[in-house]
A protein has these predicted regions:
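Conserved helicase RecA-like core
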Residues: 1-462
């Protein structure tokens, strides 16, 4: 594995995180970024872009100066949270590094307080960053600005906000655009704000193209719910994202699946941010196996290891269809994409088939014995699992880290490390995956847990 010009500290982290080899975007972009050049990097979602810009970004920071030096803009709060988490992981051997998330859905006051105390990196959404600029955010020491998923930011109407932010930063800086596509709007913005950028395009060839089996089932409109249940029982996906075109349909489908004894959660635009965080924590750690969502609510979600995508209603456009099915089949793992279509959808299905490269199989609804199990690791013996989620009433604002949580649970609480699953820390709360039996026993003996000299409330997430 070549060093790409990275320092020993960066290479140590790469080894510890288990990277066997560089992805194409990483191998080509890292040396360019270490030279300080501007860059337009075009590659698909899930290709390792965060590591590609994160490692060089960290190497350019002056940690002894707690001033904002790098700004990463993302289209959604969820993506900003994921990118910030990745940067923190890459900086594990850079003591003193401070990263703040500047995004909506959470109070702005703690964000302002973090900025006042001094941070090195800010990861945020254009709207919230612009709000902080209006309140005095200082970008005068910023040396690197990254636009992550730049095409989606412009599609979502953030173009004016992004340009206002770029105009508030020093002209002598490194400006990076990462995007899955390179439309004219990105080309025009690059011409205005970048200096002789290097263009890197990673082709979506056979070596990088995900392996996604696409299936369409023709159903009568009144039979959609019955068909969905049949599919879930036949394929038994370990994790599945069910897409609906309207939030009211999300509610109906979630209620129906819950009544049928499937562990399903709804994700739509009416959810408060705390409820959204709770839903996503349960889905990521395996407490919930089925997530029912609209396209808008699912923007920015990067769910690793998603076994299947089911379109309860066919996507309204071919581009949306491609975006939906692209959530599965990542990191070399086969994926399954199923669409329920009615007679009126046939012409749209043909358009989706053409844009996605063909290969949509038109099949009758499966039975448990007829479903093809393409990858055993993507299936579970039962949709309902024995994992539950523990809520801890403290998070990043309390300076909690996963190691603190693990230490308290294995220390004072007496749990075995092997009984503790995914630990997900948000600004003010923490979610931990535990087996149902372990969680029940823990709550009986510990209504609170002492972590870093403070007591935090424990609850079962419902």
């Amino acid at each position: 594995m070549p060093t790409l010009g990275l320092t020993p500290a960066s290479l140590r982290v790469v080894r510890e995180l288990g990277f066997g080899q560089w992805t194409p975007i990483q191998e080509q972009a890292v040396p360019v970024l270490l030279r300080g050049a501007d860059l337009v990097g075009q590659s698909a979602t899930g290709s390792g872009k965060t590591v590609a810009f994160g490692l060089p970004l960290l190497e350019r920071l002056a940690l002894d100066a707690p001033q904002l030096q790098a700004l990463v803009l993302c289209p959604t709060r969820e993506l900003a949270t994921q990118v910030a988490g990745s940067i923190r992981a890459l900086a594990r051997h850079r003591p003193g590094l401070r990263v703040v998330i500047l995004a909506g859905g959470t109070p702005a006051t703690p964000q302002r307080q973090a900025l006042e105390q001094g941070v090195h990196v800010a990861v945020g959404t254009p709207g919230r960053v612009l709000d902080h600029l209006a309140r005095g955010l200082d970008l005068s020491r910023v040396t690197t600005i990254v636009l992550d998923e730049a095409d989606r930011m412009l599609d979502m109407g953030f173009g004016v906000s992004v340009e206002k932010i770029l105009s508030a930063a020093p002209t002598e800086r490194q400006t990076l655009f990462f995007s899955a596509t390179f439309p004219q709007s990105i080309a025009a913005m690059s011409k205005r704000w970048q200096r002789k950028p290097i263009h890197i395009t990673i082709a979506d060839n056979a070596a990088t193209k995900p392996e996604i089996r696409q299936v369409a089932h023709l159903v009568a409109p009144p039979d959609r719910l019955k068909a969905l249940v049949a599919i879930l029982r036949a394929h038994r996906p370990r994790s599945v994202l069910v897409f609906c075109n309207f939030k009211e349909t999300v509610r109906v489908v979630t209620t129906a699946l819950t009544s049928a004894h499937f562990g399903a959660e709804a994700l739509h635009g009416d959810l408060e941010q705390r409820d959204r965080d709770r839903v996503m924590a349960k889905f990521r750690n395996g407490t919930t196996h089925i997530l029912v969502a609209t396209d808008v609510a699912a923007r920015g979600l990067d769910i690793s290891g998603l076994a299947a995508v089911i379109q309860f209603e066919l996507a309204t456009t071919p581009a949306t269809y491609v975006h939906r099915i692209g959530r599965t089949g990542r990191a070399g793992t086969p994926g399954l994409a199923i669409a329920l279509v009615v007679a009126a959808d046939q012409q749209r299905l043909q358009a989706c088939d053409k844009v996605s490269g063909g290969g949509i199989e038109r099949l009758p609804l499966p039975t448990p014995t007829s479903a093809k199990v393409t990858a055993s690791e993507n299936h579970t013996p039962a949709v309902l699992g024995a994992v539950e989620t523990l809520f801890i009433s403290g998070g990043r604002v309390d300076k909690l880290r996963p190691s603190d949580i693990l230490g308290a649970l294995t220390g004072d609480a007496g749990l075995q490390a092997t009984a503790i699953g995914r630990i997900e820390i948000s600004d003010r709360f923490t979610y931990v995956a535990l087996s149902a039996a372990v969680l029940q026993q823990l709550l009986r003996s510990h209504p609170t847990l002492r972590i870093k000299a403070h007591n935090f409330r424990l609850e079962r997430v419902r």
